[in-house]
Amino acid sequence: MNCFLFTLFFVAAPLATASYGSSSGGGGGGSSYLSSASSNGLDELVQAAAGGAQQAGGTITPANAEIPVSPAEVARLNQVQAQLQALNSNPVYRNLKNSDAIAESLAESSLASKIRQGNINIVAPNVIDQGVYRSLLVPSGQNNHQVIATQPLPPIIVNQPALPPTQIGGGPAAVVKAAPVIYKIKPSVIYQQEVINKVPTPLSLNPVYVKVYKPGKKIDAPLVPGVQQNYQAPSYGGSSYSAPAASYEPAPAPSYSAAPAQSYNAAPAPSYSAAPAASYGAAPSASYDAAPAASYGAESSYGSPQSSSSYGSAPPASGY
């Protein structure tokens, strides 16, 4: 093995000396490790590849090695810099950059990527305002998240079990005060920031479909029945318009159909058919039939003692 390595070194040493030359042949500066023949061949290849536009290898310096920038490229770069400065000085862009919109989009992206692996909680806040729709994703565990919808976009369609659907739209901002509703949601399918879940409600076999849409779509917000009185308060803009619809429909229906029916059909019937029949049919017949018959019969009885005592009985008895 050692003999083979020695033979290989003995053959390769003259070839290396012939190709690269000795250290004294390259000059004291050591600027080139190639011989004159190899250097000339390399320059020819470079000139052929560059079309004669490339300088010789010995004349290239760091100063002339950079490619000069064209005037069109300089103008385009200046325009881009001007646009960037104008964008940074725009107050709308600064407000958007400093607002929660970026955090909201990141939260929705995180929701779209992680919701399939675990459960989330959708929390309806205590106050739902008719402003800009905002949703915030709060991680509550390794695979658990909370989506808090704070401000749905108008119009709001609120469906309650005991009330018809009420729409809050137009006018000033309407505030709906309700107790927080927390739903435990299983992994679901999301399409364009849209969550459709089938949530079983406590103490009920009927599921509730909760839809979380992106801004600009209708939101179905199921509220607990206990907030019905607070929602119909006339102090709020949207509730004051929907409360008369519930107050005018049940109240006049019993007042105009039940009460007049009893006042004009039941009460006059006993007053005009029962009382006059008893006053004109029973009392006059008893006063004109019984009383005169008794009075004339009594007079005949009064006359009978007279006829029996004085005219009929006494004289014949005394005469015979």
UniProtKB/Swiss-Prot annotation:
Keyword flag Magnesium: no
GO cellular component: extracellular region
Family affiliation: Belongs to the chorion protein S36 family.
Biological role: Chorion membrane (egg shell) protein; plays a role in protecting the egg from the environment.
Signal sequence annotation: 1-18
Sequence repeat windows: 178-181, 258-261, 266-269, 274-277, 290
Pfam families, sorted: Chorion_3
Listed InterPro entries: Chorion_S36/S28 (IPR008449)
Domain comment (free text): The tetrapeptide (A-A-P-[AV]) repeats found throughout the protein are also present in many proteins constituting the protective envelope of other species.
Chain intervals for the UniProt region annotation (Disordered): 259-320
This protein's record includes keyword Signal: yes
Name listed for the protein in its UniProt record: Chorion protein S36
Keywords per UniProt: Repeat, Secreted, Signal
Localization per record: Secreted
Top-level division of the source organism's lineage: Eukaryota
Gene name tied to this protein: Cp36
